Regions:
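Short, glycine-anchored, charge-dense loop/turn motifs used at functional sites
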Residues: 43, 158-166, 289-299
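A conserved C-terminal secondary-structure "cap"
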Residues: 317-345
Length: 345
């Protein structure tokens, strides 16, 4: 199944100025943020289904879908970047993470395809070769990572078009929830949280990476968005491989991605696994999608396996920032300590 447009029922109204060329009032025009440095690009999201207990089969299924995505769907437009979902090589269960975990020997100062291909990681080897074969950026969803200190992380490796492992994001915020009558899930029983923000430097501009539950924390996206924002070098998008469940998905999936997009005036990209139709394992929400800086979901799948194509358009970012110039209207003199925790007085 290939998709290019959002579902009709999810098309959202958009402010009239967004589609027209405005002559902004002098006071607003003088405050306009500098144009974002970047160029438009095409992205493909693989909403992967059929993940089971056989890791080799899971990897082969992902590889086949990457090869399919490269063909560009019905339009035949090859994507510049391909994204896989969260935990695509393993069942999504705390009891499985250590069993399926792999070492990821990543040194950003020595990024190379050989570093990935020669590692003992079956998943890294496949992803590196797939990126090289596709000649496209590849955000490798996420996989369980076994660190040298024996800790387990939920980690997202990113590969450049020549197959080099260029970034590794470890999920910062762990998914520990207990919703009465809904779902109880505690990643912290197995996983350790990461401790850094991950930003890619690409020919399209800066792109930040988060994983699933990271989306619920506006501070992470805000921190990523502020990097170079004042001189037009801020992030153009933030990508989240994610696996919301069928309790939180219908409540918050669309809401949170639209909020992060509007807050930071960049694109939000969400790539989910397809929803499992049998068994008693984890049921992902699905609905992989792309939201623009005005909060419009411009492309979205439903719950089944599929490949979604969308364009990340620099003109859309610049028009949003010119029309509602919050990037230059923030009052850091009032809330300079917005991310600090204060003790009760």
């Amino acid at each position: 199944m290939l998709a290019h447009l959002s579902r009709a029922t999810r098309k959202l109204p958009i402010a009239p100025f967004f589609h027209s060329h405005l002559s902004l009032p002098r006071t607003i025009a003088s405050m306009a943020a500098p144009p974002i440095e970047g160029k438009s690009f095409r992205i493909a999201l693989i909403q992967l289904g059929g993940v089971g207990p056989d890791k080799t089969a899971n990897l082969e299924r992902a590889r086949v879908k990457i090869s399919e995505a490269v063909k560009g769907g019905t339009e035949g437009r090859k994507p510049d970047m391909i994204v896989l979902p969260e935990i695509f090589n393993s069942p999504y269960a705390t009891g499985s993470f250590r069993q399926y975990a792999e070492r990821i020997p990543f040194d950003p100062s020595k990024a190379s395809s050989e570093q990935a291909e020669s590692s003992l990681s079956e998943s890294l080897s496949m992803l590196s070769q797939a990126a090289k074969d596709a000649n496209a950026w590849l955000v490798g969803g996420s996989i369980p990572e076994l660190a040298e200190d024996d800790k387990i992380y939920n980690s997202s490796p990113t590969f450049s078009p020549d197959g080099k492992l260029v970034a590794l994001h470890r999920k910062v915020h762990l998914f520990d929830i207990d919703i009465p009558g809904g779902i109880t899930f505690k990643e912290s029983e197995t996983l350790t949280g990461g401790d850094h923000v991950t930003i890619l430097e690409t020919e399209f501009g800066k792109i930040a990476i988060g994983i699933c539950y990271d989306l619920r924390f506006p501070e992470l996206a805000m921190h990523a968005a502020r990097q170079g924002e004042s001189n037009g070098r801020g992030c153009v998008a933030m990508i989240y491989p994610a696996a919301f469940n069928c309790t939180t998905g219908p409540l918050h999936w669309d809401l949170l991605q639209r909020a992060r997009a509007v807050d930071n005036q960049f694109y939000i990209v969400m790539c989910s696994p397809a929803r499992a139709t049998d068994g008693d394992g984890y049921k992902a929400w699905g609905y992989s999608g792309v939201t623009d800086p005005m909060g419009k979901i411009v492309a979205q799948l439903e719950e089944k396996e599929g490949i979604l194509f969308a364009d990340i358009d620099m003109d859309v970012i610049n028009k949003a920032r010119a029309g509602i110039p919050v990037t230059v209207q923030r009052r850091f003199d009032v809330y300079s300590d917005v991310t600090l925790r204060k003790q009760d007085s």
